[in-house]
Amino acid sequence: MIAWLLVPATFLLGSISFAWLAGKAKGVDLREHGSRNLGATNAGRVLGKGWGFAVFFADVAKGLFPVLIARVLAEQHPDSSLGQLPIATAAAAILGHSFTVFHGFRGGKAVATALGVLCGLVYKVAAICLGSWILVWAIGYGLFRLKPGNAVGPASVVAALVMPFAHLLTFPDPWGLLNIPLTLFLFLVAALVIIKHRSNIAKLFQRQDQAPPPAA
């Protein structure tokens, strides 16, 4: 039972907004600047690329390491009730980040933390999602001339769409009795990420994210 305390602890860790802390260090409240989102993209947009990358890796870490700890605990006690501890811990990390208790349940869009969770749960799916994210970002920026920061939204949505289907293709028996929780979890994470990016999708269709043409 003590091991299950990892779940609420992870929720509290996930609720720590590294984007807000980075903004605080620079004397800026990111909730009032840029996209007003407490995430790595907005941190990079408002504070600079270095801060954006720092927030990104910190958000990945708070999803990755608790899940790895949960997996170790579950594997050490295979006959106990800890079989679903990694998934519960993963859910706590993502929910904590997305609905942080420290900022009125207004958190980030869960992309970086979800990547960390995927790396800990299903690394093949993480690699496929990351590859699809990079490809779509490059197409958006290079071909459709989206601003670098604004190409992140479409890339994240596509990666989220790819996530559950990549799992179905790469995971043995994804609909097996013991594997159904993981499969359903990935579909729910994909839905959450897409819902969190609904404003990005709306802006894309309105063509408000188009970069200006180069000067003659």
Place the predicted regions along the sequence by residue.
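Loop-to-transmembrane alpha-helix initiation sites
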Residues: A127-S132, G149-A160, G176-L186
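Short, non-helical or kinked segments that cap or interrupt transmembrane helices
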Residues: D29-G39, F102-L115, K147-A159
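Interfacial segments of multi-pass membrane proteins
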Residues: G44-L47, A70-A74, A92, V111-R145, ...
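Helix-coil boundary and interhelical linker segments in multi-pass alpha-helical membrane proteins
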Residues: M1-L6, V67-A88, C119-A127, L168-L184
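Multi-pass membrane catalytic core of lipid/isoprenoid biosynthesis enzymes
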Residues: R45-R71, R106, L135
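C-terminal ends of transmembrane helices
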Residues: A19-K24, I94-R106, V136-G149, H197-L204
